[in-house]
Amino acid sequence: MTTSAIAALTPEMIREHGLTPEEFEKIKQLLGGREPTRTELGIFSVMWSEHCSYKSSRVHLKRLPTRSKLVVQGPGENAGIVDIGDGWACAFKIESHNHPSFIEPFQGAATGVGGILRDIFTMGARPVAVMDSLRFGPILTATNAGRDTRATQAEIHKNHSVMEGVVSGVASYGNCFGVPNLGGEVKFELCYSGNPLVNAFALGLVRRDQIFYGRASGVGNPVIYVGSKTGRDGIHGATMASEEFSEGSEAKRPNVQVGDPFLEKLLLEACLEAMQTGVIVGIQDMGAAGLTCSTCEMGARGGTGVEIELDRVPQRETGMTPYEIMLSESQERMLLIAQKGREEEVFRIFQKWGLDAVEIGRVTDDAKMRVLEHGVVVAEIPNAALTDNAPVYKRPLARWEPPVDREMPERIRFAESKDFSSQLKRLLASPNICSKRWVWQQYDHMVQTNTVEAPGAGDAGVIRIKGSNRGLAMALDGNSRWCYLDPRLGAMHAVAEAARKVACAGATPIGATNCLNFGNPEKPHIMWQFSQVIDGITKACEELDTPITGGNVSFYNETLGEGIYPTPVIGVVGILEDVHKTAKMHFAQTGRKIVLLRANEVGDAVDAELEFGSSEYAKEILGAVWGYPPELDLEKEATLQRALVALIQAGLVESAHDCADGGLAVALIESALPAGVGLNIRLPEQKLPFEFLLFGEDASRVVISCDPISLPRIQQIAQEYGVFADVVGETGSDRVEIAVDGNAVISASVAELREAYEGALERALRTEPSVVAAD
């Protein structure tokens, strides 16, 4: 057999495939001096794209901690796996689907969920939970002096549309597939107007001795295509995800995949059933780069080659070329390596589930990907040329200072006569703090009947492990504004807060996954931000013993040269020894003591001024951003988390809520509103403005509540751990009363605070941008 005729490749064709002249020359060298066929050019284009090759990030990702005594599988497979005891393990991962979700919000978000679910069950794990971290541009024009008004009405209208489409897509796919969505986070900043972020997380359970890997082994074993038929949707999706957006990006809708969650549910059941027979040797999802990626990566991992015949590939459109078949990213497809002679067992199982299952090739011993059509070779590439020998760039770094004041602007003045009650209500209604009920009420969070803590009930999502009293807690977190101000410190906070949320459920963090969203890596300051974020994640994960088991990098989140804030999103998973000993977020009843657990001494006024500029209060109420994120002592953070888990597992704590966005005042109100419980809070005098006490976002703090009888024991255990346990008040009545040194500073009914907090997002999305008036 000979390689099919080569059409002339022009510099324009090479450029359109996202390849540089230098990369094209390297391709020719790897092919023994010949030029690639058009099909091979497409294959190199997707496999060498930033999305698939990690060519700009790989040198930095090597610094991440990836090992612990519990890690079964780290980065490099479809998902990471950690041992959770009793013969079980959990597979989990977070990935981005940012670019498709801007072009086609519903399908982009839906297929993002579908893709992460396939990554989980490809490992042999049954998905039991999903979460999502979403970032959008502003959804309101100015409703107070602080809100950024640079977003145009057209941008806000677009942001409404994108958000509604994304949330609907996430809900539709997860609900139809039958996996509970346990929440996540939703944030708004101006930088996401042209670059929304959709980061999907999934977790599944697998028996420790029944894990499957994406490796092609056993020369002569059949290669079997299963699942949906191949169409033209998603062609060059991976390449699109490695480019900036321009004014013509809307024309890229054909690059966005179309998902079918019902078919994916069938695929899940068929795959898990086939795995139980022992016939499956290896399995790989056809995700980014489709058949191309699954073929070459399985061969590379297994040290073998894979030969496939495109005439056998099930197709739903006529006249598809080899180029289109290899680059299609049609959803709900898998590639299996089966034991030779047992093919019929596979066919029967998938036929029972109404799915295509076709032998399209075999495993070879030459470490090459070989693609044939009508018996003619249309692509023949060494696996290493597409994987290990892909370009790796150590791009230049340039330290960058954000264009903000590092010290508090002179125009900012604090006065004790301010109406803090009104400011609190404005803050509760602000997009980043207000209730995201409108989002998570669209998700089915009770399907599978394992959910212990649903969205809005706790800082982390919690599921029980059936057949035992044990459970798993999971949380997502990331503060991009803090990473904008200080990438390293902001990344440390993302890890710490995600782990703290898990600890608030009474679970011990055991592993992490990261989704790293950035602008153009060809810009030195972007790569400096990226490197700093990696350093921050590394430091925090080492200190908190949460190794990174896998994740995703999404570069080129820019539109017309304007990039997003550096946005690392961290997912942390923790083990809960007894699901009956967990803590909700809300105060359950009156007559309970409220305690502020904190790891640190109260800071001085100078530090507080510098750190306050990164708070939600500064942005929303004062209309300014300055300074740095709060300082973070990771050793003390780890101690706080251990103390919190010990208190909850001892049955002493009824509720626990991370003190984060909006500071202490917001944490108290968020804890009070679900059950409609009032508060009587008395804070001691400190040499700080009241704003800092109420709304400062100091690190390593948790608000807990307890029966008064339990208070002495809580204080004793806290002292043993070296953690401060300040009694700040108690629950009662139907009002919130907060005093500082005996001076009333906040007085409001629970009802009016609930109205501000719970209805804000719905009101914003119901309101046309052109009629939103400023106060």
What are these language model-derived features?
Residues 52, 58-111, 115-117, 121, ...:
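Non-catalytic terminal/interface segments that mediate subunit docking, oligomerization
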Residues 3-88:
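N-terminal amphipathic, basic-rich helices that act as targeting or association modules
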Residues 5-17, 23, 33, 38-41, ...:
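Glycine-/charge-enriched secondary-structure boundary and capping motifs
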Residues 149-151:
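Short, low-complexity intrinsically disordered segments enriched in A/P/G/S/L with frequent Arg
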Residues 2, 7, 77-142, 155-355, ...:
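Mobile "lid/hinge" segments at catalytic clefts and subdomain interfaces of large enzymes
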Residues 45-49, 62, 351, 517, ...:
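Short amphipathic alpha-helical surface patches that mediate protein-protein
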